[in-house]
Regions:
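Structural signature of tandem-repeat unit edges
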Residues: 1-2, 11-25, 35-48, 58-71, ...
Length: 188
């Protein structure tokens, strides 16, 4: 069962969501712009969170994602600017472009140990992140330039408070502009 595209888009009365384990996919913009949504629990039955699913949910503070999710779609949590922490389950292999871009207060990120692909700008402009640990499973950062917008940087571009970057032993990542605009980096 899929939560259809834009099904609850702009429903400001929704404050908490605990999806049942019959749901397998959260559609594009399903809960986009639900301004008062503050807590989301995603069960292990969900394998994909589509693009913009929770974008611009400005009240979102707490997301619990269980094992089972394989892909987090583009801009899925774009501009969820009250979000402080995110734990990406180890089942996640791919995070598409700008999934968490503009989450201004996001401080702590735990990436999946099985993550292989991260799209451009995934954590772009997350100005509160101070430390990131890159797992050795990660093989590709999509550092795509341009596309007619100002998205001219890699996954962590514009994370101005980023101070420490740790690459897990065995990492073999090469990517253009991965940390472009991260002028606070002190330790690699």
């Amino acid at each position: 069962t899929i939560v259809c595209a834009a099904l609850f888009m702009g429903c400001d009365g929704i404050e908490e969501i605990e999806l049942p384990d019959t749901i397998t996919e959260i559609g594009d913009s399903a809960f986009k712009s639900c301004k008062n949504l503050n807590k989301v629990i995603i069960p292990e039955s969900v394998t994909k969170i589509d693009g913009d699913a929770f974008a611009e949910c400005s009240g979102l503070v707490d997301i619990k994602m269980h094992e089972g999710i394989n892909t987090i779609g583009s801009r899925a949590f774009y501009k969820c600017d009250r979000l402080l922490d995110i734990v990406i389950p180890d089942s996640v292999e791919k995070i598409e472009f700008e999934a968490f871009r503009g989450c201004d207060k996001l401080e702590n990120i735990k990436l999946s140990e099985n993550l292989t692909i991260v799209g451009y700008g995934v954590f772009g402009d997350c100005k509160s992140i101070s430390k990131i640990e890159i797992p050795k499973s990660l093989k590709k950062f999509d550092g795509t330039w341009g596309r007619g917008t100002n998205l001219s940087y890699g996954a962590f571009g514009g994370c101005s408070n980023l101070k420490t970057v740790n690459f897990e032993a065995g990492s073999t990542i090469v990517c253009a502009a991965l940390f472009m605009g991260c002028d606070g980096i002190e330790e690699i």
